[in-house]
Design a protein with these regions (language model features):
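Solvent-exposed, non-transmembrane regions of membrane-associated and secreted proteins
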Residues: 2-189
Length: 189
């Protein structure tokens, strides 16, 4: 009996140590990533001409920063919308134009992290996107809910539009059946 308790205590201690080690590695990696974001953010201070479509950018590369004043939130925007990229911040849909360009720029984020408060946005709220091409202010036009497989939210638009997408319902456990969409129009750059 005493030996069993000793074995269990050793296992518990080992698991605790491993868990602590994993947590410390994750904290270190997050701090390292945040430092790289600050470096990339500093590069955004040099305006570049706005590029039209399909600029080759590496997946996971920081392309800008999104700020939503009403939510008091600012996040990095990275190229790509797969889970790997969305763990880094807000993802830019690769087949959409860059923010600030005439057409539909689509950004996606996880409902349980960067876009957890997206449902609080209302018509007229501001969304500010800063890239190496400049700072672009968008005004929310509307929000709505679609099925997860609805591709109409990523279609081209005749004006500079920003479309934000996240899974819905916000507190759903598992793979969400719907998407929450916010559409905003460029008002200033």
């Amino acid at each position: 009996m005493r030996r069993s308790i000793l074995v269990l205590a050793t296992l518990a201690f080992t698991l605790g140590g491993v868990s602590t080690g994993v947590a410390l590695v994750q904290i270190y990696q997050m701090n390292d990533f945040q430092k790289s974001i600050k470096t990339e953010y500093a590069k955004l201070d040099t305006p570049q001409p706005v590029q039209a479509k399909f600029v080759p950018i590496k997946l996971g590369e920081v392309i800008g920063v999104i700020s939503i004043p009403k939510l008091a939130e600012t996040y990095p925007i990275v190229q790509g919308t797969d889970d790997k990229e969305l763990k880094l911040g807000v993802g830019h849909y690769v087949n959409s134009v860059m923010p600030g360009v005439k057409d539909n720029s689509v950004l996606s984020g996880h409902r349980d992290s960067v876009f957890s408060k997206l449902g609080q946005l209302r018509e007229g709220d501001s969304v500010i996107v800063r890239t190496s091409s400049g700072t672009f202010t968008y005004r929310v036009r509307k929000s709505w809910i679609v099925l997860a497989n609805d591709r109409t939210v990523i279609v081209p638009t005749p004006t500079a539009t920003l479309t934000l997408t996240t899974c819905y319902p916000f507190f759903y456990i598992g793979s969400a059946p719907k998407r929450f969409i916010v559409s905003a129009d460029l008002v200033q750059n």
